Amino acid sequence: MVELLEARGHAVTRFGRAADEDEAWGPTAVRVARAVAARDADLGVVCCWTGTGVSIAANKVPGVRAALCTDAETARGARRWNDANVLALSLRLTSEEIAKEILDAWLGEGYGGGEDASLAAVTDAEKAR
């Protein structure tokens, strides 16, 4: 995945196992999410066996909207309607070909607007924690 992103011209900061660090998925997902929330990275991609754990961990960081995507259309919608900024993937379910499709859809789409009130409600709930 890192090679695919770099081949498409994206600057990639590696965390956890992708950086040859012996770090579990939870702390790695939080580090990625913090980089996105701090605007040190525009977007983040996190992976674990199901994708669920990393999406939960990343979503604990204020300002992060992590979306677990198993196909390109879900990835496209997560960016367009939810302004998701962290992509979570399942290592078990996502083949290399599907990962390429998901990444292309994710990177090719931006927030389309029209969901500002819903996103503001999510942000308000986040602040109320």
Regions flagged by a language model, labelled:
Residues 24-28, 69-70:
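Short secondary-structure boundary/capping elements
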Residues 27-50:
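Short, structured active-site "lid" loops
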Residues 46-47, 52-92:
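Mid-chain, well-packed structural core segment of small domains
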Residues 1-3, 56-60, 100-101:
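Short amphipathic alpha-helical segments
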Residues 1-11:
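Glycine-rich phosphate/diphosphate-binding loop of Rossmann-like nucleotide-binding domains
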Residues 72-129:
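C-terminal binding/interaction regions
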Residues 11-23:
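A short beta-strand-loop structural module common to alpha/beta enzyme folds
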